[in-house]
């Protein structure tokens, strides 16, 4: 086959994702797109070819739900979707509670046709189920099955019909050339193609292909067992592939679905079986296909018993035999999310990997938008390939987390649940001190961060009834009342915080100012010694990130951002840098300690002869001071809304700084405080927004209540959109709500955790003019104000202080009141403490 000598884009991989990316690129106006695969068409041998092809709509992740819903829309438009309905059944009370959570998520994301069923109702829809084995089910009418191979063919044909797509099956990639850190050429068995961009959509082979370019895609091939049994007498004469709802037996990590005259049974309950991409055979050597391995019967024995329990009529029928059984290979990542976006290793090299059939077309569309327009309609920050830190890309980490996550595919995962594998990778220099204080560690970007300290138990007695106690087992998981006690200790005296997980990078050189001006919404041409908190916008004026920037010199800026977003922010700034600017990652060479509270100044003053008075050290400024024997960069800024500083030192001096502050703080009642205070209680009392919660690309600065009086003259990414937003009436307004009554029908008090739908008093969903529904973006205690605080975007007519609404939580509706519309804090609304 003759290949073009040049392509604007080469898409490698003809599964559902590759076909979708290629089609949507041509739909958005790109020509000279080449789509190739080493396998034959229509089934080149990847995971698409053996996928079960059913799609459930509801996920607790807003991002994944949006990609799935868009995929279903596209499958329907292509005529390859059969709506069958689906039921997730529960064998336990805990699972029934989880199904009520899924009902709430459906409400938050606008999925209709959902209901909770009792066993009899499940039996009416799935007559071959043994209803005595279950307590109930969660029905989603919009569930269905697709013909993903046919969908891929139709997409290819659309691109070819437009004259913009060249398709090359049976063409293997042998190399990807990179020059000056940018992709230049794709080498194949049929010749070379000069390429401006390359998209790797190779599924389980993606890491191997990425390595050809010196890049990394962190995923591992893993086994998912499936069998087909039949012929099933009940399905004899079936007029379509599926006529009964698909069943997910959630407590056993299994599913059962009609497949014509057969029953397909799949499992995520067996032991994790992982492979390396190099272990996958070539197409010509595979017995069935490169991603269909021999079935290991021993791994399925227990699962077959579970299927027999649930569907004895079919599975127990001796006339129904096994017709097909495989260890199907699919992609797993260390955090369970796809790997999308431009590689941080090589410019022009894009990834669309670890994407399953259910979100394939939606992902292809979103990635194409990102490539063409610089962003997608759906916020993809949780799937961004740039999110991974270096240790998270290692083979050992990928395999450890993938193995742990595999059996949680249908698991009940708490919003705060922590990973157990591959911990203690990044430790603060004062980690031993924290352990001595009984720190309970949560992980952030590999860093072990104290969430609370068990040594603060005496504070529970000190603050007594001011501390909320949770009695519900669910809300008590991964939580302690000590968080609220530490919060009050900080508010009344002072708190010491481990902020080691910050990502810190310097931008220096003659082009430094122009680089940060381009990326930041706020004015960065400020005097040296100033600290600027700034949103970072996407081209359409949504939130790419939010962070602080210190100007340390005429040509020296220090960017400080969160650990989770750190690597993506680093790539974003690096991509915007102009000539004469350089970026240096300081994260592993510095450590940060936070000191806040009304006595923070007294504590710091006891360690230094420098002037730290309000007149001598204004809020929003930074400078180097001497703390004991150390030179410390002190930044007077606060994310908890109290007087204090972030203190930066070289990492080898961090222990000494901790000890110095701890000793100085003892007479002042200094308490070690965890991230439960920093990231939740302190933040929410001040109505501070958080990236990934309140701040997403789907919302703008005006809606978030973060507009400044003026817009700087200098250009920056998203400026045109931002100016337009300032002239328009916002479609939604960020509000702070408080819960009026926590009592459930049982009398137990319940506390929302986030992502619950907000409803009107007559129980109607609130949707703005752009189609975005209202849901709780953040939730947590406000110990100083004595309220449980929720944040949510509301339409202008509902964003009225005093307006009463409802929040749906665990199958019940609780009254809430709009306490703030906009940015005014609940606690210290005049900001007198932070500026004291």
List each model region and its residues.
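Glycine-rich FAD pyrophosphate-binding loop
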Residues: 26-47
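Flavin-dependent oxidoreductases
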Residues: 20, 56, 70, 176-294, ...
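Beta1/beta-strand and adjacent pyrophosphate-binding region of the FAD-binding site
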Residues: 3-17, 34
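C-terminal catalytic lobe of FAD-dependent flavoproteins
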Residues: 148, 251, 286, 290-425
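Glycine/proline-enriched, intrinsically flexible loops and inter-domain linkers
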Residues: 389-836
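Dinucleotide-binding Rossmann-like beta1-alpha1 core, especially the glycine-rich loop
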Residues: 51-125, 251-256, 260-266, 274, ...
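Flavin (FAD/FMN) cofactor-binding and adjacent substrate-gating region
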Residues: 77-78, 82, 93-162, 166-169, ...
